[in-house]
Amino acid sequence: MILQKKLSICADDFGITEKVNKVIIRLIEAKRITETSCMVISDFFFEDAKQLIKYRNNIGIGIHLTLTDFIPLSKIKSLTNNGKLIGVTNLFMKSVFQNYSESEIYKEINLQLDKFEKALGFRPDFIDGHHHIHQLPLINNIIIGIIKKRYPGTYPWIRNSNESFFRILKRKTSIIKSIFLSVMGVKIKKLAKENSIKTNNGFSGVYNFSIDKDYGQLFKNFITDINSEHLIMVHPGENDEILSNIDSANKSRNLEFNYLISEKFSQVLIKNNI
């Protein structure tokens, strides 16, 4: 008997624009994804979040913590420039040198969790981060502390981007970027284990968001040699002027959606016993 593998397919960025929200809802209804993570900091989250409530028992609904590029919910002076959160490169450098206010980050993350719970009426099933910021030095410890304090005994699980070096090589897709994110995920995975917080077992979905790539082939690479409880991040959507102004991956979102909604996607999962 061949055991079926359990695969998590998480659509990131619910809330980023109305069109992305509609695409994610359509994928949920078609049973093509298993989770979505919500960008509560965006202006397009709160009203559309109500549409997710009826799918509460069908998919995992998590929070996509955001500390880059958008306008924060609080006055977080150490991470903003003219009222807007700094870019991911600057945040990475600040995290390495711990050049920011822990109390400001603590407050901002709690406010984002408050907004999620107010919109949906329940705590997030899991926690991850826009640009993987939840894994950055110090921020990872802050998040673990918040989880333990806010949700004693019922911890949300947390995403990690750690993956086997040999599996990354085997998949032959954005190898350097995948290795970087894998290293980045080591600490949060360790912290989760030490604190009895569940986390995924394997990670893929990393590529350069090029529209010249065959996303169907990329996805086949993503599911090469996976563990049970492996997680693939996806970024489906529909491009428009709003998305173009805030998201570098805007053009590839259409390609991802078209593949995920297609019959080819379903057949690939069946063929690979997923």
Locate each region found by the language model.
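Terminal accessory/targeting
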Residues: 1-8, 18-59, 66-126, 136-274
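Short histidine/acidic/glycine/proline-rich micro-motifs that form metal-
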Residues: 131-134
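DG-centered beta-turn motif at the end of beta-strands
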Residues: 11-15
